Amino acid sequence: MSNTEHNVESKNVTDTLDEILRLQEDIQARIGSSNHNLETNFESIKDFVSRAHAYIPILNQISKDMIEICERTQALKKKTSQLELSDTNIEDGSTTSTPTTTNKSQ
């Protein structure tokens, strides 16, 4: 192998190694960017889960309150219906009246 051939071969190897180095740097930059995106997304997810956990007791209380409101509404509807029947009986001259019960919690 002559000195010229050796120099050409050496240049080809150097060029190939330079290309490999550029590709490695490019891959490293992409991976770094991906890692940054993953870290950012992970922080966003952690924040979301943290806020969701904070709302669970509030939602549970709202659910209990809604059930209580529905129960009270049904009791008021029943009482209204009984009062309407009582008024109807009085207007008809009927002597019977329907007893009404009062709920102290209302």
UniProtKB/Swiss-Prot annotation:
Tree of life domain: Eukaryota
Region of interest (Disordered), ranges: 78-106
GO cellular component, one term: BLOC complex
Subcellular location: Cytoplasm; Endosome
GO molecular function list: protein homodimerization activity
Coiled-coil ranges (or none): none
GO annotation, biological process: endosomal transport; positive regulation of gut granule assembly; positive regulation of intracellular protein transport
Major site of localization recorded for this protein: cytoplasm
TM segment ranges: none
Keywords tagged on the record: Cytoplasm, Endosome
Stretches with biased composition (Low complexity): 94-106
Biased composition (Polar residues): 82-93
Function: Component of the biogenesis of lysosome-related organelles complex-1 (BLOC-1) involved in gut granule biogenesis.
Entry's family note: Belongs to the BLOC1S6 family.
Subunit architecture: Homodimer (isoform 1). Component of the biogenesis of lysosome-related organelles complex-1 (BLOC-1) composed at least of blos-1, blos-2, blos-4, dsbn-1, glo-2, mutd-1 and snpn-1. Isoform 1 interacts with blos-1 and blos-4.
Name recorded for this polypeptide: Biogenesis of lysosome-related organelles complex 1 subunit 6
Gene behind the chain: glo-2
